[in-house]
């Protein structure tokens, strides 16, 4: 019977707070114009403040954004890194093939963040992110002599471009500090540089006998029809370059990220100059690799296309096989129809694009950036090209039929080549989760301590307040840094570390709320309804938590809102200093930690601006909402100001 009465009382209190009292409570119904509950009045007053409403919308939108947006990023990984995409600015120009080239394509090539193209009329075009880091070079600044020449071949490396004119002249521009092109005395003295061949510098190359021009990471190779090879550039990037100098008999050559690779006339292995490297093959990414000679069974390798750490080989029967390592979740090699076979293969950093004798185009391999999403309707292609994360299909007239893959990055990339937008979204989720859990912990402790201390008073109040003062006397930031440093020496999982950080924030930030609740309870316990409850014999715990606490809930809500913003800033401060959530797991704080040097602040502004903006906007809006709640819930505080 008593439980039913309690339920009715609590439900009645909630009903009156949010929906107002019954008209039957009035002595004269005809004199009642409108009865508004306290809750409705608070809501009405809040929505009259346009700035507060805007701030609340921003906070809600931010919450929904950081918790829902990751659901649409199934390929996101905290540990993702990509050397060829480091420090790229915001933009979507990587697939922006110039309109003049799109109607008359002869060559398209790319190794990193920019692409180079040559038209059938001999004009050269460059697009994408063309500025080379902080070097000051911009490959879009095409030398005048190249613009005046009739270009027949071109290839792009990570930071340079090599082009060949119809007269055999070899042109190079971009970064040349590690022997990418040109001849300098300092190159000859550097053991880590293989200098541009003197005969090519003086006499050029016989264009009619050039079979392939290809560039890698700060290196270049030219394959001649007679099987000889010219190779030069950064030997530190490709330690096996010496194995290709003065060696002939090659039918194809290319660069992975770490090795020069080639196919010799025998066609029974991938040549690297190192025994045991790339000596296993498989038909698909899902299969287990076996020894190369066992896989070939007399078939011959006639061509290759190299990605970052893998190779696709074309066999003389029109089939393909894979060598090297592939990312998890890679797309499988397509199953061709009877009579269909591959006639050309091009490679990106992690994906491959193949053209069949029936004009069909397929892509497979790594698909983290949608490199394998071939548009429908490409059935009459005669030539394909691939960039680092892009692919192109061209018809017999040189007209671009389709392009697919990475367009660019909304917020640019960081120093590891990761998408800043995706890290901001996932970092916001982590920051808000840590802040919310910390506030819940501090609220539970603060409300219990404050309510007990304020209601019972005496020795209970004395003991609890001394404990509170003890916690408040702990210097928060040094203590948190010390605990984080201790944890870094312990074998803790990242999730456990994050949980401990939440607990640290919660356990050290409840003292202010406890004092506030204590003061409100001390004031409220002298009211008549409390005295009446005591006279009726209601238990002290029930009076404290069921009668007094609901009357101070408005102050608690305001404090929780403001404390949440404080916890966001505190977590971000710890992470910024390197003592919070650790890289590679992102938070807004540790993303700012990666942008704390002058080079990044000046040259790579997007790496700190976006996380800083999200953090600032969120905390400011939360504070605006909290201040407005305080004003509408406590009219006296507003009047005092």
Regions found by a protein language model. Give the residues of each.
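Glycine-rich helix-loop "coupling/hinge" segments at transmembrane-helix boundaries
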Residues: 485-487, 562, 570-610, 614, ...
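Amphipathic cytosolic juxtamembrane alpha-helices at the membrane-cytosol interface
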Residues: 418-433, 453, 457-465, 522, ...
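Conserved core positions of repeat-based scaffolds
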Residues: 114-117, 126, 160-163, 172, ...
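Short glycine/serine- and acidic-residue-enriched loop/turn motifs that recur at repeat junctions
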Residues: 97, 127-147, 174-201, 233-249, ...
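Transmembrane alpha-helix signature in integral membrane proteins
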Residues: 54-58, 111-114, 119-122, 421-455, ...
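Short cytosolic juxtamembrane segments of multi-pass membrane proteins
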Residues: 530, 624-641
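Generic hydrophobic transmembrane alpha-helix motif, especially the helices
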Residues: 441-446, 454-460, 464-515, 519-521, ...
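Transmembrane alpha-helices
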Residues: 429-445, 541-573, 622
């Amino acid at each position: 019977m008593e439980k039913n009465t309690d339920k009715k009382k609590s439900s009645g209190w909630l009903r009156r707070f949010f929906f107002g009292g019954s008209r039957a409570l009035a002595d004269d119904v005809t004199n009642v114009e409108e009865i508004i509950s306290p809750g409705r009045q608070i809501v009405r007053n809040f929505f009259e403040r346009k700035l507060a409403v805007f701030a609340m919308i921003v906070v809600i939108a931010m919450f929904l954004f950081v918790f829902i947006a990751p659901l649409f990023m199934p390929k996101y990984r905290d540990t993702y890194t990509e050397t060829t995409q480091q420090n790229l600015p915001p933009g979507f120009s990587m697939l922006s093939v110039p309109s003049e080239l799109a109607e008359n394509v002869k060559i398209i090539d790319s190794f990193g963040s920019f692409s180079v193209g040559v038209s059938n009329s001999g004009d050269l075009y460059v697009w994408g992110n063309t500025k080379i880091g902080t070097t000051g070079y911009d490959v879009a600044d095409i030398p005048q002599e190249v613009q005046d020449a009739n270009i027949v071949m071109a290839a792009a490396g990570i930071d340079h471009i090599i082009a060949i004119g119809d007269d055999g002249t070899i042109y190079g521009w971009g970064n040349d500090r590690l022997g990418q092109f040109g001849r300098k005395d300092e190159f000859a003295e550097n053991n880590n540089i293989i200098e541009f061949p003197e005969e090519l510098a003086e006499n050029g190359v016989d264009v009619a006998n050039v079979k392939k021009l290809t560039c890698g990471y700060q290196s270049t190779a030219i394959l001649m029809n007679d099987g000889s090879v010219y190779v030069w550039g950064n030997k530190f990037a490709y330690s096996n370059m010496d194995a290709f100098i003065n060696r002939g008999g090659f039918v194809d050559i290319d660069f992975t990220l770490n090795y020069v690779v080639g196919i010799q006339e025998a066609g029974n292995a991938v040549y690297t100059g190192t025994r045991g490297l790339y000596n296993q093959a498989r038909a698909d990414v899902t299969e287990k690799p076996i020894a190369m000679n066992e896989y070939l069974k007399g078939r011959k390798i006639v061509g290759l296309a190299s990605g970052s750490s893998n190779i696709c080989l074309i066999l003389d029967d029109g089939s393909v096989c894979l060598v090297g390592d592939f990312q998890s979740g890679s797309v499988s090699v397509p199953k061709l129809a009877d009579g269909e076979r591959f006639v050309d293969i091009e490679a990106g950093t992690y994906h491959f694009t193949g053209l069949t004798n029936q004009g069909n185009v397929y892509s497979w391999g790594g698909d983290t950036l949608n490199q394998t999403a071939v548009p429908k309707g490409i059935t009459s292609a005669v030539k394909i090209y691939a960039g680092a994360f892009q692919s192109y299909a061209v018809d017999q007239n040189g007209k671009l039929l389709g392009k697919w893959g990475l367009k660019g990055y909304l917020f640019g990339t960081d120093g590891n080549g990761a998408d800043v937008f995706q890290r901001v979204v996932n970092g916001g989720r982590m920051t808000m989760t840590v802040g919310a859990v910390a506030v819940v912990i501090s609220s539970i402790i603060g409300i219990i301590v404050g309510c007990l201390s304020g209601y019972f008073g005496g020795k209970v109040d004395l003991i609890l307040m001394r404990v509170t003062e003890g916690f408040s006397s702990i210097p928060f930031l040094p203590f948190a840094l010390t605990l984080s440093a201790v944890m870094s020496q312990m074998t803790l999982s990242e999730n456990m570390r994050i949980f401990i950080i939440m607990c640290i924030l919660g356990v050290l930030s409840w003292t202010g709320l406890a004092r506030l609740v204590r003061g409100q309870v001390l004031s409220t316990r002298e009211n008549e309804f409390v005295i009446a409850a005591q006279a009726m014999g209601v238990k002290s715990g029930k009076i404290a938590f069921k009668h007094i606490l609901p009357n101070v809930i408005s102050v608690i809500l305001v404090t929780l809102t403001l404390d949440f913003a404080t916890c966001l800033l505190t977590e971000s401060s710890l992470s910024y200093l390197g003592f919070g959530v650790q890289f590679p797991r992102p938070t807004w704080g540790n993303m700012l930690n990666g942008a704390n040097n002058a080079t990044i602040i000046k040259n790579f502004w997007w790496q700190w601006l976006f996380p800083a903006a999200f953090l600032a906007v969120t905390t400011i809006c939360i504070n605006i909402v909290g201040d407005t709640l305080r004003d509408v819930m406590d009219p006296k505080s507003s009047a005092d100001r």
